[in-house]
Amino acid sequence: MSSKEQKTPEGQAPEEIITEQHEEVEAVEPDASAEQVDPRDEKIANLEAQLTEAQNREREGVLRVKAEMENLRRRTELDVEKAHKFALEKFVNELLPVIDSLDRALEVADKANPDMTAMVEGLELTLKSMLDVVRKFGVEVVAETNVALDPNVHQAIAMVESEDVAAGNVLAVMQKGYTLNGRTIRAAMVTVAKAKG
């Protein structure tokens, strides 16, 4: 008998059995691989998740640093602006006693005496020109009466009964106050009106 003629007990040639078994193995392999997860695929998935997480952290860090830099830039601009705006504060503080002295000299000057007229005019012009100069740089005088007491620019030193001025308003200014670009350099010392009673 030739090998082709040899049959297995079931009546199949050995090549047919091998082919059938090979097909069965191929048919079984996809099912087995579907159930088994390759550890390399699992590791790749873990690494991809870690990479995504690291990228997100890095992106958040970059955004945080950008925001901090923008805030720092803004704060620096404000600081420089304030420094420019209030650089004169010390200088103006040094000028205030001179302005006060000129004010006091005008208050006590004998304006009725004709011999003092030239001196009084000189003091008035000096004071006016000095106030004009400091106004150019943002200095304002706080000396109004009959205005509401503002604790930001007024320092109340006494309360006096008054019929002419509403209660809580400035009755008299004892010492002028000054502001530089809206910031109080020296509060005005004032007396405040209170209702008669």
From Swiss-Prot:
InterPro entries: GrpE, GrpE_coiled_coil, GrpE_head. The keyword Chaperone applies. PROSITE patterns: GRPE. GO terms for biological process: protein folding. One of its GO terms (molecular function) is unfolded protein binding. Residues 1-41 are annotated as: Disordered. NCBIfam families: PRK10325.1, PRK14140.1, PRK14150.1. Homodimer. Participates actively in the response to hyperosmotic and heat shock by preventing the aggregation of stress-denatured proteins, in association with DnaK and GrpE. It is the nucleotide exchange factor for DnaK and may function as a thermosensor. Unfolded proteins bind initially to DnaJ; upon interaction with the DnaJ-bound protein, DnaK hydrolyzes its bound ATP, resulting in the formation of a stable complex. GrpE releases ADP from DnaK; ATP binding to DnaK triggers the release of the substrate protein, thus completing the reaction cycle. This is Protein GrpE. It comes from Enterobacter sp. (strain 638).
